[in-house]
């Protein structure tokens, strides 16, 4: 009971008076406070919605017995007992506060020490732990564990690294995201399509000599291996080259994009033309965009106000061309083809159909599928 007492005391200090366990999770249930500002990875990769569902299912199964479960695991740690795979899975899905995660860290170290030379099917704990850290804004803990040499092999999948890079990217911690990328390379974890997207996005945001070297190295590696540069990664790389005033390089990168029929690609192309083509060519491009048939079935090109301003600035010294530009600008405006979005916002935009909110899990579902009773009377009350 001494073990239980110390654990309970610790949790009470952290949880401000011992709120109901399920109410605590319900309050953090739309647990992605990042949802409105999350940019790059979709829920198909992050799987936060699926993770939240599993958490609620686990909490429902042992409702009222979380302390006892944590006591049982603590007792195993004290007795040097073997931590089973399903026990760690359950533990991670029960965590709802930072002290819970701190306790889970101890269990992870023990579990990995016991099982680092044993494979248990295809299950990987790394992504589960990273989703937990993403949910609770614990990027410091996630980064520390990911870089810890004693846990080599625990985070052996690219998804764990991608989730952490995405978390750091949304928080503007670009230098630390580079640390994750370097650590991923040091641990010889194979880069995925999403890794490249995140890597070029971070380089674009940093816009410094070091990120320029990283970007160049990655582009050279992709060229050597013959891999296909993901479209979103290519857009970031081209935009980064424009930031660096390497206009021909931006044009070369852009030429590798297979499908350019998007608002982002059209704006990138316009900006590249502004810096590499004649102003006559730029005007022809814009005039062609206003010359559509008017059919609702034909998608009209849409341009960023910011990018158009760059084009207009270039034409200021040429009165005749600038007059033509103003005429085209007015036609685009009248047709609703000018967007307030900046190029940066277009780059960091995730399509709505690929973005799922986690909040609806608790907000929309009011009735239990099993009992047809209100969830207010079961899961969410003290």
UniProtKB/Swiss-Prot annotation:
Gene Ontology BP, a term: regulation of mRNA processing
Q: Which domain of life is it from?
A: Eukaryota
Could you tell me which PROSITE patterns the record lists for this protein? PPR
Keyword annotations for this protein? Mitochondrion, mRNA processing
Q: Which Pfam families match?
A: MRP-S27
List where in the cell it is found: Mitochondrion
The PPR repeats are at 159-193
Q: Does the keyword Mitochondrion apply?
A: yes
- What would be an example GO MF term here? RNA binding
The reply to whether Methyltransferase figures as a keyword in the UniProt entry is no
What InterPro entries does this protein map onto?
mS27/PTCD2, Pentatricopeptide_rpt, PTCD2, TPR-like_helical_dom_sf
Major localization listed first in the record, in broad terms: mitochondrion
Query: Can you quote a single GO CC term?
Result: mitochondrion
The entry assigns this protein to a family as follows:
Belongs to the PTCD2 family.
Q: What does this protein do?
A: May be involved in mitochondrial RNA maturation and mitochondrial respiratory chain function.
Descriptive protein name: Pentatricopeptide repeat-containing protein 2, mitochondrial
Species the sequence originates in: Xenopus laevis
Write the lineage as a comma-separated list.
Eukaryota, Metazoa, Chordata, Craniata, Vertebrata
């Amino acid at each position: 009971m001494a073990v239980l007492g110390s654990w309970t005391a610790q949790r009470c200090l952290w949880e401000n008076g011992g709120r109901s366990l399920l109410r605590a999770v319900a309050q953090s249930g739309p647990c992605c406070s990042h949802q409105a500002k999350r940019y790059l990875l979709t829920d198909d990769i992050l799987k936060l919605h699926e993770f939240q569902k599993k958490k609620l299912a686990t909490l429902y199964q042992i409702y009222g017995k979380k302390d006892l479960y944590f006591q049982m695991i603590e007792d195993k740690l004290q007795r040097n007992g073997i931590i089973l795979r399903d026990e760690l899975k359950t533990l991670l899905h029960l965590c709802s506060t930072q002290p819970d995660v701190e306790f889970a860290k101890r269990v992870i170290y023990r579990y990995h020490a016991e099982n680092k030379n044993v494979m248990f099917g295809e299950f990987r704990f790394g992504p589960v732990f990273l989703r937990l850290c993403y949910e609770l804004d614990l990027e410091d803990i996630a980064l520390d564990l990911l870089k810890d040499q004693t846990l080599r092999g625990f985070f052996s999948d690219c998804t764990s690294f991608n989730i952490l890079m995405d978390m750091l990217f949304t928080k503007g911690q670009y230098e630390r995201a580079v640390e994750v990328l370097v650590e991923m390379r040091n641990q010889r974890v194979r880069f995925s399509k999403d890794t490249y997207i995140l890597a070029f996005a971070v380089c674009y945001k940093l816009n410094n000599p070091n990120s320029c070297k990283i970007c160049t190295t990655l582009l050279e590696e992709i060229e050597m291996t013959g891999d296909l540069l993901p479209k979103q990664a290519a857009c970031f790389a081209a935009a980064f080259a424009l930031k660096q005033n390497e206009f021909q390089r931006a044009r070369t990168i852009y030429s590798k994009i297979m499908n350019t029929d998007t608002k982002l690609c059209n704006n990138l192309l316009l900006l590249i033309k502004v810096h590499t083509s004649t102003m006559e060519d730029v005007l022809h491009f814009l005039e062609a965009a206003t010359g559509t048939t008017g059919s609702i079935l034909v998608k009209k090109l849409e341009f960023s106000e910011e990018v158009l301003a760059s084009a207009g600035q270039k034409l200021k010294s040429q009165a005749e061309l600038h007059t033509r530009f103003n005429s085209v600008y007015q036609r685009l405006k009248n047709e609703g083809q000018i967007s307030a979005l900046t190029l940066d916002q277009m780059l960091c935009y995730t399509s709505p159909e690929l973005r799922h909110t986690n909040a609806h899990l608790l907000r929309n579902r009011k009735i239990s599928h099993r009992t047809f009773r209100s969830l207010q009377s079961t899961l969410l009350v003290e």
